[in-house]
Amino acid sequence: MLPVINNLLSWILPARETIAARASIQARPPLQAVGINDFLNLEIPAREMLLAPILPERCLAMLYAPRGLGKSWLALSMGLAVGSGTPLLRWSVPRQRNVLYVDGEMPLVSLQERLKAISVPFGTDTPNDGFRILAADQIDGGINLSSEEGQRSLEPLLADVDLLILDNLSTLCAATSESASDAWVPIQNWLLKLRRREIAVLLVHHAGTNGRQRGTSRREDPLDTVIALRRPEDYSPEQGARFEIHFEKLRNRVDGGGAVPFEASVENVGEGIRWSSSDLKPPLLMQAAELFAEGMTVREVASALRISKSEAGRLRLRALTDGLLVAELQSEDSPVRVQ
């Protein structure tokens, strides 16, 4: 009898799903195309900026970086900036908005300690509901946003939210394969629904071994903004959170405005922190190539750049290999010229 019941269930359950899917399609209004003139005359509200010029209203964005570089420090600070209406680094905040920050990784005590330090520069400007935190460490079983059930569980918290920050994809969507593009579709559909509801979303993610965002590139297709954090060439661990901010995608910024990369760093000040920014220095390789092109020797370049002679020699060889320089002679200190 049991095999018969199992066979019946194997037929009934898919049939029910098919019927439900058809009913859902039939319930939708018919599709309607709009003519070009009618479309151009539609009164569509312009998108204001949440964090100008990189995060507009109703945007989908990603911030990614290698582990331990400081992406959560930056994501938390971006959220507090929007939630308090306070500028951050080289970005302005036209007006205060409501932010929900969903953390899927940090222990609760670490998250609290970090937020205490980050919140000091913002003073008392942040309304209590301007920046709200949902931490997986407070929830038995954590948070699984790769399932419809997990997505629905956020609904009561999204009513007045302008910006939703998900930190990070690996922990909040752990049930989904990072490399399988089809597995991303249900999450992408949910994100697009949030955008239609005028909720902006910032995804925090890890970089892979190749330096790109880890997993399927399909994630980037609907995104308005993609921000990559990279380690400076002269970085050392004792410097803490110090990184280069690069903008790999800024949709609708055809003039390149706001897309200029820069360096950001954090320093401890009393019980809080302070962010600072600076223009990017030319990469060490480019600096060395320019000095070699001026006729400097390996020893002179090493002294000018405050690096070892062996490092200067390696940079010279790499510049030659990459075609940045062309040697006229074959000795170590032979003159070179720019290719």
List each language-model region with its residue ranges.
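Short, small/acidic-rich helices and loops at N termini and domain boundaries
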Residues: M1-R28
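C-terminal regions of RecA-like/P-loop NTPase motor modules
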Residues: I12, R16, A159, R196, ...
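The Walker A/P-loop phosphate-binding site
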Residues: R22-I118
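Short gly/ser/thr-rich secondary-structure transition/capping motifs
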Residues: N41-E48, L145-E148, T209-N210
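Amphipathic alpha-helical transducer elements in NTP-driven molecular machines
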Residues: E48, E105-L108, Q112, E148-Q151, ...
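Conserved RecA-like P-loop NTPase ATPase core
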Residues: L55, Y101, D167, L223, ...
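Phosphate-binding/switch region of NTP-binding enzymes
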Residues: M62-L63, G68, W73, D182-N268
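Conserved inter-motif catalytic segment of the P-loop NTP-binding fold
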Residues: R67, P94-S177, S278
